[in-house]
Design a protein with these regions (language model features):
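Conserved ABC ATPase signature
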Residues: 151-155
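Catalytic Walker B motif of ABC-type/P-loop ATPase nucleotide-binding domains
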Residues: 176-179
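The feature captures the beta-strand-to-loop junction immediately N-terminal to the Walker
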Residues: 54-56
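Conserved beta-strand-loop-alpha-helix hinge in the C-terminal portion
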Residues: 228-250
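Conserved ABC transporter NBD signature motif
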Residues: 74-85, 93
Length: 253
């Protein structure tokens, strides 16, 4: 397919500070109706960590995730590597933080798989050969090589979820943020997704209600409730704290 170039943005990776990919300090956010969705959130992710974000509906998980690449903007401090999230750095940070929505149909809007996966690199102003290379690499990473000319809306839910992940991997992010990746998948597709997430060599923050997924895949777990981080620690320890889990509407898998 022909590729139309956009104005280039910086393609330099975000430099880490003390090994931290993400630092959130005292983040507070209220919606226009006055509802306070986040209360003084503190969170840090080191390079290579895979962290589960859990909690009941309405805990603030999705609101927090929408702050990580500037879709929402609350009070407090948020840094990706050493860069503060602000208008000056927003393009670089959005390339460094790949956000994958729960519903892949919210992310796949182009006629073909190739065009969906090429969208991000194309809007970075990359040359055509690099765009094609990134698309091929991203599709290979998610086990979807050869699907470039397929129509995105004709794919199964499991395939769409993989393509959604490929759309952000083509940006070569330093942090992958996923919202409910296993939702709506049959057992085979869920197992395939778990294997994919395990094998991807990238820092990850994953919001999920799938506690079996948390136990299997994530060494660290962060629990949110009513807009606050109420626990942050080793998954095995937190999952054995039945009082804590019950208090915050969670069940041991």
């Amino acid at each position: 397919m022909p590729i139309t170039h956009k104005t280039p943005v910086s393609k330099t990776a975000v430099n880490l500070v003390d090994g931290k990919v993400l630092t959130v300090e005292n983040l507070t956010f209220s919606y226009p109706d006055g509802y306070v969705a986040l209360h003084e959130i503190d969170l840090a992710l080191s390079a290579g960590e895979k962290v589960a974000l859990v909690g009941p509906n309405g805990a603030g998980k999705s609101t927090l995730m929408l702050h990580l690449n500037g879709i929402l903007n609350g009070a407090g401090e948020l840094r990706v590597g050493g860069l503060p999230l602000n208008k000056k750095n927003i393009a670089l940070i959005r390339a460094a933080v790949g956000l994958v929505f729960q519903n892949p149909d919210d992310q796949l809007f182009s006629p073909t798989v190739f065009e969906d996966v090429a969208f991000g690199p194309l809007h970075m102003g990359l040359p055509e050969d690099e765009v094609r290379t990134r698309v091929e690499e991203a599709l290979a990473q998610v086990g979807m090589s050869g699907f470039g000319e397929r129509l995105s809306h004709h794919l199964s839910m499991g395939q769409k979820k993989r393509i959604s992940i490929a759309t952000v991997l083509s940006m070569r992010p330093q942090l992958l943020v996923l919202d409910e990746p296993s939702a709506g998948l049959d057992p085979r597709a869920r197992r395939s997704l778990i294997n994919l997430l395990r094998d991807l060599p990238i820092t990850m923050l994953v919001s999920t209600h799938d506690m079996a997924l948390v136990r299997e895949l994530f060494p660290r777990m962060v629990i949110m409730d009513e807009g606050r981080v109420v626990a942050d620690g080793e998954t095995t320890i937190l999952l054995n704290d039945e009082v804590l889990l019950e208090k915050h509407g969670l069940e041991k898998p």
